[in-house]
Amino acid sequence: MESCPSENKEKAMSLLHSFYCWGHVGVVLLSTLFFWFFGIADWKILALLWVIIPVCNGILFCKVPIAPLIEEGETGMSLRELCKNRIFWILMLMMMCAGASEQAVSQWASTFAEQGLGVSKTIGDLAGPMSFAILMGSARAFYSKFGDRIDLDKFMQASSLLCIVSYLCISLSPSPLFSLIGCSLCGLSVGIMWPGTFSKASAALRNGGTAMFALLALAGDVGCSGGPTLVGFVTGLASDDLKKGILAGILFPILLIVGIVSLKKAKRYA
């Protein structure tokens, strides 16, 4: 996406990532309908049906033209150069926190809805993960439309603050309904984090190349795994109190704000 000849790459990056959210919504909705009609016992059949998606993606990807990230005559940064660059490590921290902030709530949203509201898994999936994904996609679509009028740094900082508020709402509110609203609000707040960090990386390290984006994606995936793991670990220590587990996850949006501020300072003195 960063190599495409578009005028505003930040908007394009946000629009691209919004389709991940719409895919998320589709998977939750169709899977919920499958379980509603055929029961959870047949989950293996559903897994086989979903295999069609990556197979089709693989075929389509073979036909996608990919423009080079580095212009002709220039050389990208080596892995060694990246590892010596302070800005790169700040970006890695931001990506890890972006993934963790998103998945720490998303992965537990269905369970939280079932336990907090006492509803069935069907309602829990629709009220939890699907509402989270809809609002996350809406945030990305919003930035893709109005991104040229919005300062990305301020938008990411405001989103991180909103994420902190949503975590507090989920974990401290005495009302299960307000806690569930906090889950949805979290989806809205994390929308810009992942694509925004990619865009900031492209602007900060113009010769980062494919290696940089691959490592940033790896950091994001580590966060996607580490966030829910931390929540689950703390929940177990707190006698299966999921609210306390999610409260521990507030560390990630706080660190993301630290990363955004540190990146601005590092670029100023670079």
Model-predicted regions and their roles:
Residues 7-66:
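Helix-loop-helix hairpin linking two adjacent transmembrane segments in secondary transporters
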Residues 66-91:
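Juxtamembrane intracellular "pre-TM" segments in multi-pass secondary transporters
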Residues 150-197:
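C-terminal transmembrane helical hairpin of 12-TM major facilitator-type secondary transporters
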Residues 30-39, 113-114, 146-147, 232-240:
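Interfacial helix-cap and linker-helix signal at transmembrane-aqueous boundaries
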Residues 1-5, 192-205:
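Intracellular juxtamembrane helix-capping segments at the cytosolic ends
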Residues 56-65, 248-270:
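Multi-pass alpha-helical transporter architecture, strongest
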Residues 85-130, 134-138:
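Extracytoplasmic gate region of multi-pass secondary transporters
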Residues 206-238:
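A late C-terminal transmembrane helix in Major Facilitator Superfamily
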